[in-house]
From Swiss-Prot:
Disulfide bonds join 41-119, 74-79, 125-325, 204-236. Keywords: Calcium, Disulfide bond, Glycoprotein, Heme, Hydrogen peroxide, Iron, Metal-binding, Oxidoreductase, Peroxidase, Secreted, Signal. The keyword Nucleotide-binding does not apply. There are 73 peroxidase genes in A.thaliana. The record marks 68 as: Transition state stabilizer. The lineage of its organism: Eukaryota, Viridiplantae, Streptophyta, Embryophyta, Tracheophyta. This is Peroxidase 56. Belongs to the peroxidase family. Classical plant (class III) peroxidase subfamily.
């Protein structure tokens, strides 16, 4: 009897230890895991990296659109590649107003073609988007993170869903917080992912209202630095619909923390950038990032990208693995 009690006690002790260790172990969400293709297509991530590095080497400005494409995919229907689909009637996400300035689709096509040649029908387009976004940042000497893979591709794309789900450059802080929370992202994620604006361009129509008619009285946004507003008006006339503007002037091809310095100086390009100062928690992170050497932001960016990459994923037998990213099988 004593031996039996000892055996039971040891078993219970081991169970407790197992549970404690499990609570600290990294968990995979909804079937995703790092290295999902290690056996089925062991060269997959290397193939993606090689293609992306070559693309960024040829054009450093392409990195930001590739990052943005993944963001736009995840916020609409989840990270399942619907932003890549094309419909004959043009009623797809690609043709929604927020997505008209997306570019880099040919790079996704090239990566997918290389993967299909190596291991047909294995790597999903949604995973391609996730891997490409990471590798584009690394190619700029930006942050790196382990990408969870195992997503499957969606079958539906809808032009109206992008307008309903994508955060707008005109949003105030309350709207931004609500939108991010609806995707399982918190205030810190909002600020960190907004930091992606350290690279890339905006366009005049996105700030015309801030410059010329913010309250309907022909005035500019009082939250925009006066001197900076003058410079922007010199580049963007009220009817300008095409001119591109550097999100992070002088540093828009370099991934760094300088975006937060601009925001703190009231020089964020979009109204949504300025809004980060309108909440104590988001403002605190902006100011905290000013006093780091970038390492905190880089680490946090990777964490938030992993979280974003879990939004609404399809795994297992749900969805499909497309042969070509622009169409369902």
């Amino acid at each position: 009897m004593a031996a039996l009690k000892m055996t039971i006690s040891c078993f219970l002790f081991l169970q407790v230890i197992y549970c404690l260790l499990s609570s600290f172990a990294p968990t995979n969400v909804q079937g995703l895991k790092v290295g999902f293709y290690d056996k089925a297509c062991p060269k997959a991530e290397l193939i993606v990296k090689k293609s992306v590095f070559e693309a960024v080497k040829n054009d450093r400005t392409i990195a930001a659109p590739l990052l943005r494409m993944f963001f736009h995919d995840c916020f609409v229907r989840g990270c399942e590649g619907s932003v890549l689909l094309e419909l004959k009637n043009k009623k797809d996400e690609k043709n929604s107003i927020p997505n008209l300035t997306l570019r880099g689709f040919e790079i996704i096509d090239n990566v997918k073609a290389a993967l299909e040649k190596e291991c047909p029908g294995i790597v999903s387009c949604s995973d391609v988007l996730a891997l490409v976004a990471r590798d584009a940042m690394v190619a700029l000497n930006g942050p790196s993170w382990e990408v969870e893979t195992g997503r499957r591709d969606g079958l539906v794309t809808n032009i109206t869903e992008a307008l309903l789900n994508l955060p707008s450059p005109f949003n105030n802080i309350s709207s931004l917080i609500t939108q991010f929370q609806s995707k399982g992202l918190d205030k810190k994620d909002l600020v960190v992912l907004s930091g992606g604006h350290t690279i890339g361009n905006g366009h005049c129509p996105q700030i015309t209202n801030r410059l010329y008619n913010f309250t309907g009285k022909g005035d500019s946004d009082p939250n925009l630095d006066t001197e900076y507003a003058v410079k922007l008006r010199g580049k963007c006339k009220p009817t300008d619909t095409t001119t591109a503007l550097e999100m992070d002037p002088g540093s828009f091809k370099t991934f760094d923390e300088s975006y937060f310095k601009l925001v703190s100086q009231r020089r964020g390009l979009f109204q949504s950038d300025a809004a980060l100062l309108d909440n104590q928690e988001t403002k605190s992170y902006v100011l905290k990032s000013l006093n780091s050497d970038g390492s905190t932001f880089f680490k946090d960016f990777g964490v938030s990208m992993v979280k974003m990459g879990r939004i609404g994923v399809l795994t297992g037998q749900v969805g499909e693995v497309r042969k070509k990213c622009r169409m369902v099988n």
